[in-house]
Amino acid sequence: MKKQPQQKERVSRWKGTYFKRNFVFILLIACIPGLLTGGAIYFLSIDKVEKELQRSHETQVAREVSRMDEKLGVLELALTQMAYDSSLMNGLAERDLEKDFTFSYQLTKKLFLLRDQQPLIEQASIFLNSPRPLVLSPEYSALTEQEALRKYRSLLASDHSIYWKRSGNQAMLIQLIPGAAEKPFGAIMLAVDPKEMESILQSLSPYPDGSALLLDQNREVLFHEGEKDFEKTLLHEIKKQPAENGHFQMEWKGKVYSVSFGEMNRMHQQWTFVSAAPLSAITAPMVFLSKVIIVMLVICIGLAVCMTWYASKKIYRPIQHLLGLFTGGEKKTWQASGQDEFKWIEKRWQDLSLESRKLQQQLLRQTPHMKKSFLQHLLQSDFYYDNEESLRFRMEEAGWNIGGNVFHVLDLQVTGLRCEKSIFREGDEQLAVFTLTNIAEELAAKRVFQLSILDIGRLSVTVLVMKTNSSDLKAYITELARQFGDVTGLCLTSTLSSKTERVTEIPSLFQDVKCGKSRRKFANRDQVIDLQADFPRDEQFAPYYPFELEKQIVQTIRLERKQEAKELIDGCMKELSEKAAIDRHVHSALIQLFSRIQEDILHSGLNPSELFQHRNPFLDISELREPNEAAAWLMDVVVTPYLSKLEGRKNRQQKQLAERVIAMIHEQYMADISLESCADALGMNSYTLSKAFKQVTGINFIDYVTQIRIEKAKELLVNTNKKIHDVSEEVGYRHNYFNRIFKKQVGMPPGVFRQMYQETP
């Protein structure tokens, strides 16, 4: 009972002059423009629109004719190219296709390919008159019937090397071969698909009652699309026209048709195209539409009066809604104050704006952390199920200004921490990355583009770059590397992804960069890896590995020659950096070398986990970026601890004995050498010698002799032409036993091994 007087008072307050004025104003806005537009369309524009539609139809016909001419031209060009293909046509007259299956297959394949590439072709075939008449259609078929042979030979009597010919109800394109010869010995024949041509002709007259024709030089119908009775009348009217091209109007069955016709030059022939469209179908929709507009306007006037009344009642509702939003629980306070609605809204707006600014300042302080967190989750594909619009919205919320920018992912890898020029040392990795981040941000600010940097550890940072134009991004990378090197003495490897306009593709770019950075050269110098560029095909070959150096390194480690092992490892790293070149190949080689050394460690009875202090050597290898660093890691982490452990387990006399035995094996491996003979020569027990030899080398005496003999046999098989029997005798084996032991050790007989390596370029 208390709310009813307030409801009445509120309604009577806004239904006054403001309501009436707005009612009349809205009614005028709704009615007058529509009446003026409808009248202008109906009384002034019908004639112009009809002419414009007619011109538009003629333009469409010309455009579709041009497309049809282009498609036929492409067909002719494809046939000509095949006729002048020297790899197929040279010597074709002398080839016996019945016996030369390879060449017949190539011709048949070419015909299939030509038919598949050209949708206009229904059938492609080749007729050869010599050395024996035959047809490839595209299957091989000899011509024995004289009537068929006479029909095909008549194709060769044309004065033109390429021409169109009507064959029954089908049009064929004929190319004589060879194209430039006076006496052709064959022809390539393409039969045009009538259904495809009907589809093309349909575009000349897309109206339901329209028709389109394509006539040859004798004005006979080649292709048609439409009603046959109408086409006969249309053809009769075309033949009466004195001009070669133009347009006219004709009447048929109470309908007026607009007819356009013209000529097309097709290989020394003049074809005629005809397009007929009902004029009523072109212009009637506009007349009908204008009448509909007038009727609708009359109806709309009545509706406008009702809707204007309803809309005017709704005009005050936005103000009422705003008051509800801004007043909240203070509605009674506003009513008691008697203040104007808009002034009250203005006051509340200012209060809310002040609160909003405070919240924005707090948000700005958290924005860098939000950006890094979002970028980290984005790169890790944590937003896999989010769509593009959602990700863009979240990025803009996090503080990025995306706009029309394109995205690049850039990986910056710092190298040279052990270099003499470096101002940093081990343990300063975070400081080096911090310096790089500052220089990158300052340089980006000067070049006016956005970037976000994420430290992913191991002296590497990932950068998300946003630019409207990526043309100067390489210049930025070059300048960044130069400034960073001048300040720190370190080198920088930059891996640049391809560009994308989609946020959802950024994780894929990050994965590409992670894989692509392994293409860097294994050297301490500034490098730029642009994943948009094509890389040399050489990188697809098998990576290089110095097997001989590996043997020498392992042997020197077995003999505990630390300095010699260091020199060999330095040489190996230098050779790998020059020949294996890129990171992933060098890392694979390092893993192989490490595994070989670890095998010896296991043979010696040591536990690699305890020796390496439970660290992950393979992870360490993946982080090596330069030869000096790799050599130092092998010596410091692998060789030196291993040799230190061995010093307390082996005595010098055993090593000297092993060295003397190894020397004897290398000198006498081709003879009947045995452990007993070596023990007799050294004046000691064979059991003691065997135990000492295995403790030093990691393998027993027989296996070592077998290994030396097999390696020598491999060298003789690959580098000489000696018989396998002679090779077996030179390495100290009988022929039959040599084959068995070689296959057991290598996995294949010696003959197969020689053939495989001699065939390898």
UniProtKB/Swiss-Prot annotation:
Membrane found in the keyword field: yes
Topological domain spans for side Cytoplasmic: 1-22, 307-761
Pfam families noted in UniProt: HTH_18 (PF12833)
Bilayer topology annotation: Multi-pass membrane protein
Domain HTH araC/xylS-type: 659-756
Protein name listed in UniProt: HTH-type transcriptional regulator YesS
Main location: membrane
Organism lineage string: Bacteria, Bacillati, Bacillota, Bacilli, Bacillales
PANTHER family: ARAC-FAMILY TRANSCRIPTIONAL REGULATOR, HTH-TYPE TRANSCRIPTIONAL ACTIVATOR RHAS
A GO term, aspect molecular function: sequence-specific DNA binding
Induction field: By rhamnogalacturonan type I (RG-I), a component of pectin from the plant cell wall.
Alphabetical list of SMART domains matching this protein: HTH_ARAC (SM00342)
Compartment list: Cell membrane
